[in-house]
Amino acid sequence: MIDSDGFRANVGIIICNRYGQVMWARRFGQHSWQFPQGGVDDGETAEEAMYRELYEEVGLRPEHVHILTSTRSWLRYRLPKRLVRQDSKPVCIGQKQKWFLLQLKSQDSAINLSSSGHPEFDDWRWVSYWYPVRQVVSFKRDVYRKVMKEFAVTALSFQTLEIPRKRGRQKTTG
C-alpha cells in the first residue's frame, strides 16, 4: 500500500525483555542491523500486519508477546535516491510506519529466524535500549530516535533490577 505521497505503509516492531533490553536483528546476508518491520497489506490493519510480520520475521506468535503500546501517529522516513526503484509504479519514496512495543512473555528459544521460507534476518541479540539509535542506517535514524523516545518510559518501567544471566541468546551490546 503506497499512499498518494509515495510512502509505503509499514509496521515496525520493538521487542523488549524484562531487563529493558531490545531485540536487535541482522539483515540476512548483510552487515546492517535493525528492528523487525514490514509492509501492511491491502485490507489489513496495522496490528494484523504487526502479528503477521512478527511471525514471518522472528517466528513469534501472539501468545509469545504482550503489546505494551504503539506510536500515536505514523512516522515517516525517505529512502536515499539510490534505493528508490523508479521503474516500479507507483514509485515508493519511503516508508510511513506505525510502531509497536512488545514485551516478550516466552523464553528466548521461541524466537525462530527461519519460520518463513525467506528469512529476513540471520542473527539477533539483546542490546541496551538506546543502542539501536546510534547503530541503525542513517536514513532511519530520525524515526528510530522518535519512536525510542516515545516508548522509553513504558519500555524501561518493565525492566527488573536483576542482572541478565548469560544463557542462550542473552548476548548484550551497548
From Swiss-Prot:
Cofactor annotation: a divalent metal cation
Stretches assigned to the Nudix hydrolase domain: 6-149
Top-level taxon of origin: Bacteria
Single GO term (MF): mRNA 5'-diphosphatase activity
Gene Ontology CC annotations of this record: cytoplasm
Motif Nudix box: positions: 38-59
Enzyme class, UniProt record, top EC level: hydrolase
Cell cycle as UniProt keyword: no
Alphabetical list of NCBIfam families matching this protein: PRK00714.1-1, PRK00714.1-4, PRK00714.1-5
Similarity-based family: Belongs to the Nudix hydrolase family. RppH subfamily.
UniProt-listed PANTHER family: M7GPPPN-MRNA HYDROLASE
The name this protein goes by in its record: RNA pyrophosphohydrolase
Taxonomic classification: Bacteria, Pseudomonadati, Pseudomonadota, Gammaproteobacteria, Alteromonadales
